[in-house]
Structure formats: C-alpha cells, structure tokens
C-alpha cells in the first residue's frame, strides 16, 4: 500500500499479513496488523492519526499521533510522535525516536492547504532529515519528501490529459479526423 490517503483503517487481527509494505501513506484511522503469525511487514514514511497495532515487522520514519501504540517483535527507528502516545515511551531516545512533538511545529496545517496537503512538513522541523539513513540517503519522516513520496491528491508529476474531444463519426472515405486534446503540467 503506497501513497494513499486512508480513512477507513487497514488490517484485521484474524488474517495473517506477510511481506506487506505500507509506505508514504496518510492514515486517519487505525492500523491493525496484530496477528501473532504476521511476518516481515514494512511500515515506513507514513503519517498516522489513530491507533497502531503491529506484530513482527519494521516501523521507521513515521509520524504518529494516536491513543495507543502497540508493537511486538518490531524494530522501531526514527519515528516522531505528537505528544506521548501510550506504548511509544519505551522507544523514545533510542534509534532516533522522539516524542512530545506538536502538529503546529511539524506540519503546514490545513490553512491554505488541501486535506492531504496539511500533512506536508514545515521547514526546519525535527522531521526534516529525521529519517533513517539508507544507502547514503537520509529521508524526511512522514509521507512526503521520501524517495517516491506521497503525491498530493494522487496526481503524479507528469502531464495529465484532462479533456479529449473526438467526433462521434467521420464521413466515409475521410483520411483524417480532427481531435482536440487538452493537457495540464502537474510539476
């Protein structure tokens, strides 16, 4: 699951989840990957606004604001929390994990931004360059600005065709047809 804005939550403790990757997402609801048979799940560079339950995986470069943080047999590195969520305290001060951050300090906020754009980082916050260095690259924490980061409104940085006008029919024997194509640059 990559570059999604998720409002309905993910997971179920009844199902075994193996080799899942959740990267560069914004979660406004719960993440429940608490089946004890889960294995090798990667949760990296996300923004979480609700509870997290994760068994057997890797959790890094995330920004969390939730009521509970429950992990078992999970490597927890370079995450930031808004306030001090229950269960996150044992990880604070180790492997780059920090707590007691605030939305106002980390994020741009809703004013002048879209629903998903409000979670972009403010310059100079601990989340900027706060991710785990891999292959000589130190990403930001959160969903944006990581390698292959979250894309606002899901629109990639490539030209988009937003209108196409084609005649319903052309006269028999006509060698050409006029078509109108409208594009927009999303860079």
Where are these regions (language model features)?
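Predominantly extracellular beta-rich ligand-binding scaffolds that present long acidic/polar faces
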Residues: 1-115
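Generic ordered-secondary-structure signal
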Residues: 18-21, 42, 58, 63, ...
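A broadly tuned, weak detector of single residues within folded domains
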Residues: 72, 120, 174-175
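Generic short alpha-helical hydrophobic face used as a protein-protein interaction/packing hotspot
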Residues: 83, 131-132, 185
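C-terminal accessory segments
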Residues: 95-156
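Short, compositionally biased P/S/T/A/G/V-rich stretches that sit at domain boundaries
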Residues: 139-177, 182-186
């Amino acid at each position: 699951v990559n570059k999604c804005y998720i409002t309905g939550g993910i997971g179920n403790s009844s199902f075994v989840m193996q080799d899942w990757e959740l990267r560069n997402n914004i979660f406004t609801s719960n993440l429940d990957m608490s089946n004890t048979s889960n294995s090798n799940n990667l949760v990296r560079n996300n923004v979480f606004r609700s509870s997290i339950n994760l068994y057997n995986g890797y959790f890094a470069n995330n920004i969390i604001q939730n009521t509970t943080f429950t992990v078992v047999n999970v490597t927890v590195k370079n995450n930031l929390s808004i306030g001090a969520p229950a269960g996150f305290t044992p990880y604070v001060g180790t492997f780059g994990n920090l707590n007691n951050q605030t939305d106002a300090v980390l994020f741009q906020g809703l004013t002048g931004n879209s629903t998903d754009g409000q979670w972009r980082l403010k310059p100079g916050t601990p989340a900027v360059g706060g991710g785990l260095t891999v292959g000589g690259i130190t990403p930001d924490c959160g969903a944006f600005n990581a390698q292959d980061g979250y894309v606002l409104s899901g629109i990639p940085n490539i030209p988009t065709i937003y209108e196409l006008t084609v005649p319903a029919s052309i006269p028999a024997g006509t060698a050409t047809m006029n078509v109108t194509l409208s594009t927009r640059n999303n860079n």
